[in-house]
Amino acid sequence: MQSLVQSCADQVWPAEVAAVIASRPDAPGLEWAAERGIPTAALFHKEFPSREAFDAALAAEIDRFEPDYVLLAGFMRVLTPGFVNHYAGKLVNIHPSLLPAFPGLHTHAQALATGVRIHGCTIHFVTPVLDHGPIIAQGCVPVLAGDTPEALAQRVLEVEHHAYPAAARWLAERRVSLTADHRVDVQGDPNRLFIWPPASL
């Protein structure tokens, strides 16, 4: 989240961060955002009787700010189909693997267990099928001999901090569109691939 906010300010995107909203009132990003004058809100998911009730309240909170896009960053809850469909074409997530490989949790351990030599992250539109939506961009890192899940996660985080802000800027500049076969096209950036460290692969 911080890399998105900072990139938006530093690179002077044609956009502003409307709000930062968390599912836990103690989320550290809330204080960080508030210190920078960004509106914040928190809805504690354990105070709601069901996922549907929480998602309905979350949607109502988001809609107060009338955003063009909703970007998930560190939001670890599975969203209900009703919520996802409410923001169809506007809801974006980052996942720590090169989808469609390794959906779900523990992606770095999965990558090491299967012996892949390249790992990374995927920025994608969210659909009701978990970790399955149209891919906006991907970031790649090498898997090195002796890697641990923690070491690999840190390397992936570095490429995330480049790929996600770039994808968000494309959205802000209205350069992202979906083709008839539900693939993403980005005007001016046909490759949509980030390699970290540069020239490492």
Identify what each model region corresponds to.
Residues 7, 23, 69, 73-187:
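Donor/substrate-binding cores of folate-linked one-carbon enzymes
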Residues 61-67:
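Glycine-rich phosphate-binding loop signature in dinucleotide/nucleotide-binding domains
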Residues 181-201:
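Short, basic/aromatic-enriched C-terminal tail that caps enzymatic domains
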Residues 1-28, 32:
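N-terminal Rossmann-like dinucleotide-binding module
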Residues 36-37, 87:
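Short, structured coil segments at secondary-structure junctions
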Residues 41-46, 94:
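Short beta->alpha connector loops at strand-helix junctions that form conserved
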Residues 46-59:
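Glycine-rich, highly charged phosphate/nucleotide-binding loops
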Residues 1, 29-30, 55, 108, ...:
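A general structural signal for well-ordered alpha-helical segments in protein cores
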